[in-house]
Regions:
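Nucleotide and nucleotide-moiety/phosphate-recognizing core
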Residues: 1-128, 133-147, 154-156
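SAM-dependent methyltransferases
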Residues: 157-171
Length: 171
């Protein structure tokens, strides 16, 4: 996914680079493509289970204490995202914007996340929201913010994504 000539994953990685020691990407296609940007891509270890599969592979690849997850199809995130989620304390936090809960934009303490994911997957529970509830993650409201979404052709066009750019860089 490319917006205004910049890969969306690179755009997001740059935004959070000051806070991160490494950027991990959950992707099931074109993994070598991400290395061109200095990113480490990982395919789901359990196929076909949705976003929790990506979260599981990232949690197991993560070498730091904390894991910030951001969906690549968000339009924009506030620069205060990570500091505000971190202030919630505990095992992490989940973001909410004016459109509601954003379960794929969250911060996790990795040593709590790994066993929670293992327990959820052991009973075929594939809901990220449910796993977050089991962890007791608080919701942090970003009032006045709309993270947006890049799912439909209209969303992509309005965000500056060309059809050629988007088709060439999916994965």
């Amino acid at each position: 996914l490319v917006r205004d000539g910049v890969a969306q994953v690179v755009r997001l990685a740059r935004q959070f680079a000051p806070y991160c020691t490494e950027v991990l990407v959950s992707a099931n296609l074109n993994l070598p493509h991400y290395a061109e940007y200095g990113l480490h891509a990982h395919a789901d270890r359990v196929a076909g289970i949705g976003p929790i599969g990506g979260l599981e592979v990232l949690a197991n690849a993560c070498t730091s204490t904390w894991l910030l997850t951001v969906s690549v199809d968000v339009l924009q995130l506030p620069d205060t995202l990570l500091p505000r989620l971190a202030q919630a304390g505990g095992e992490g936090a989940v973001s909410c914007d004016d459109d509601g809960l954003q379960p794929l934009v969250a911060l996790y303490r990795v040593d709590a996340l790994r066993p929670a994911l293992a327990a959820a997957l052991a009973v075929q529970q594939h809901s990220v929201r449910q796993m977050q509830a089991v962890l007791g993650l608080p919701h942090v409201l970003f009032s006045g913010a709309h993270f947006g979404n890049l799912n439909t052709p209209e969303d992509l066009h309005q965000a500056g994504c060309s059809d050629a750019d988007s088709a060439a860089h999916r994965g």
